[in-house]
């Protein structure tokens, strides 16, 4: 097995490319930095196109990552640890990372083509929560996620890539406004169910329904907006002790999707066999 070459010169074009990608003020985001072995491998499997993958010269690269890069013909090089330290002066120093081309943004039509339930996050802004919800939604068979008023300019945001462990490109995650989201759900006959503290239904009731749903979750402070409340086919609550004010939104999504998982898994199996 040939060892990756080591970049020892800070003037190497790859070093400047990394500097450019990590600038916070970029007007146009066409490439992004993806850090750590697991997110890199997940993004590669999801079909994200990588320009190159890098490792710090002081840390061995995972053989599984090297094999995957070789299979997909992705160049791999090491960077001298002193240069890595300069590249990531004021932030967490990545030991392995890659420069990737940002995929085409997912569209609502991409979600429509899939049969699973839709997760709508209305005003959820904490990136760590969004990342956890991405992973849970993928694991429990959701068709995709619609982010409304998330304050994210792109799903290629490095914070979201970290929080989702790279899974953000493995299912459609769409940025939309409230009107677009409601129109999309109506046009595709997807029943809109709002999670609320005083719901008409209990979360267990979700498992009894065979129709496709959009599960709407608001922020822990504000809850879902009036537009989603008005458009809803019903409201759903998660039983909990009265001494607990609320659940973390990522936990609520996990509970609701677990109740819907049998239905969503069946849809996924049927699509795979078609």
UniProtKB/Swiss-Prot annotation:
Per the UniProt record, which EC number(s) apply here?
2.1.1.230
Disulfide bond residue pairs: none
Describe the effect of residue 165 to A: Significantly decreases activity
Give any GO molecular function from the UniProt entry.
RNA binding
InterPro entries, from UniProt? Answer: Alpha/beta_knot_MTases, Ribosomal_eL30-like_sf, rRNA_Methyltransferase, SpoU_MeTrfase, Thiostrepton-R_Mease_TSNR_N, tRNA_m1G_MTases_N
Sequence similarity: Belongs to the class IV-like SAM-binding methyltransferase superfamily. RNA methyltransferase TsnR/AvirB family.
What is the name of the protein in this document? 23S rRNA (adenosine(1067)-2'-O)-methyltransferase
């Amino acid at each position: 097995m040939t060892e990756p070459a080591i970049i020892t010169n800070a003037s190497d074009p790859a070093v400047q490319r990394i500097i450019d990608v990590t600038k916070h003020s970029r007007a146009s985001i066409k490439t992004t930095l993806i850090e750590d072995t697991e997110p890199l491998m997940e993004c590669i499997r999801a079909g994200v196109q990588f320009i190159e993958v890098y490792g710090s010269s002081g840390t061995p690269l995972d053989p599984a990552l090297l094999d995957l890069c070789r299979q997909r013909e992705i160049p791999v090089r090491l960077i001298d640890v002193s240069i890595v330290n300069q590249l990531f002066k004021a932030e967490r120093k990545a030991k392995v990372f890659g420069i990737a081309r940002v995929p085409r943004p997912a569209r609502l039509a991409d979600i429509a083509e899939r049969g699973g339930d839709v997760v709508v996050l209305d005003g959820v802004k904490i990136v760590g929560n969004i990342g956890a919800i991405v992973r849970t939604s993928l694991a429990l068979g959701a068709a995709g996620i619609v982010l409304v008023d998330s304050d994210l300019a792109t799903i290629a945001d490095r914070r979201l890539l970290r929080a989702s462990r790279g899974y953000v490109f493995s299912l459609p995650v769409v940025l939309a406004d409230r009107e677009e989201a409601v129109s999309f759900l109506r046009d595709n006959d997807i029943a809109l169910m709002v999670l609320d503290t005083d719901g008409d239904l209990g979360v267990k009731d979700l498992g009894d329904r065979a129709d496709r749903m959009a599960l709407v979750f608001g922020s822990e402070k504000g809850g879902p907006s009036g537009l989603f409340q008005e458009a809803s086919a019903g409201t759903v609550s998660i039983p909990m002790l009265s001494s607990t004010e609320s659940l973390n939104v990522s936990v609520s999504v996990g509970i609701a999707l677990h109740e819907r998982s049998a239905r969503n898994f069946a849809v996924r199996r049927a699509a795979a066999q078609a």
